[in-house]
Amino acid sequence: MGAVTISVVALESADRIELPGGSWSRMLVTQDRVGGNASSLGYSVFKPGSATTSVSHEVEEVAYVVSGSGRLDTGDGEVRFRGGDALHIPSGTWHAVVNDSDSDVVMVFGFPHPDYPPTERR
């Protein structure tokens, strides 16, 4: 068996991606950062009262809500979530993250794609 390379990526080392309402995201595991990966991982903080643009990814998305509560607005209504919940968003599903609470929502998310996947926005 060949040598295994394990990558460690510090949150602060990834570029901050600004989102609406003071929210932000960082892509931690990507092809540029670790290379040879088949999946990607990111970290987001959604500020109280914020809402993202509605997006649809070419691949499924999974997420874990570390803390806070809010909802996903989808084409079929809304889905509530809170800290400790895991989310599975099928590919092609339109969704927006809405923090309708008075505290931050912290979420870790991933895709079966080596980078942030091709995405439509509306």
Q: Regions from the language model: what does each represent?
A:
Residues 34, 102-103:
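Short strand-connecting beta-turns/loops that link adjacent beta-strands
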Residues 52-54, 72-73, 89, 95-101:
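Short beta-strand His + acidic residue motifs that chelate non-heme Fe in jelly-roll/DSBH
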Residues 76-92:
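Short acidic-glycine-tyrosine-enriched beta hairpin
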Residues 25-30, 41-57, 91:
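Conserved short histidine dyad/triad with adjacent acidic residue
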Residues 41-44, 88, 103-120:
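A short hydrophobic beta-strand segment most commonly corresponding to one strand
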Residues 58-70, 75:
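Glycine- and acidic-residue-biased ligand/ion/polar-headgroup-sensing regions
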Residues 1-38, 119-122:
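A short, N-terminal "cap"/entry segment at the start of jelly-roll beta-barrel domains
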Residues 58, 77, 93-94, 103:
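A generic "binding-loop/recognition-motif" signal
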